[in-house]
Amino acid sequence: YLSSILALRPDNGKLLWHYQTTPGETWDFTATQQITLATLELDGKPRKVLMQAPKNGFFYVLDRATGELLSAEKFGKVTWAEKIDLTTGRPVEAPGVRYEKEQVVMWPSSFGAHNWHSMSFNPQTGLMYIPYQEVPGVYRNEGAAFKKIDGLNTGTGFSDTHEIPREAVSGALLAWDPVCQREAWRVPHSFYWNGGTLSTAGNLVFQGTADGQLHAYSADKGQRLWSFAAQTGIVAAPISFSLDGEQYVAVMAGWGG
């Protein structure tokens, strides 16, 4: 069940179905990113679906009752696989991406095209708002005995961003149409590792950024409406609450892991 989505009965833990997003995972691509439930109109019929945009760069839509893979498309720059075969449900991998004989540069890196930072779905616009990041990685086989004294030891031998040119690294607020499986709009950011998103019924979407800004956008078109300087980076997702009839937005600031 490595890098898998599992459906379990809550009363007894019985496994109902599972879907593996990255079989034989060897790049630190996980399937622990947020899962969103919604009802989408697919082929003229309402379907109760499960949606996920994991680190591997593919946006998955599954029937949440049966685990049937309905669609899967790249939501950003992905070079480790050509596509997801909808018949087998498995990725069609690019040659050499398992770095068995020589190192490989590929997208995304272990930072992921989308990491733990929350995405949000707006039923009114029908869009998913993803904290997208574009960070390539250098993967190499350094052997089982290799250990980094001052770094992460994941067994992948993946690089950190010091090996990557600064101009190759970026982030964005990405509005994704899960029905058509395509980008609706995006707002580029100068850096990656930006905050999670919040979408509201008032046609608003909020996101904090690594450079310390909290932005409000129109949810349908991505027009920036206002910004607030938090004076420190933001990685958390904002929340909204009502007090004495007024709606407020709050976010925890402080840039980190």
Residue ranges with predicted function:
Residues 92, 102-105, 111-135:
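Long, low-complexity segments enriched in small/aliphatic residues
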Residues 50-53:
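Extended hydrophobic secondary-structure segments that form protein cores and membrane-embedded regions
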Residues 1-31, 36-46, 58-105, 136-194, ...:
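Extracytoplasmic/lumenal domain signature
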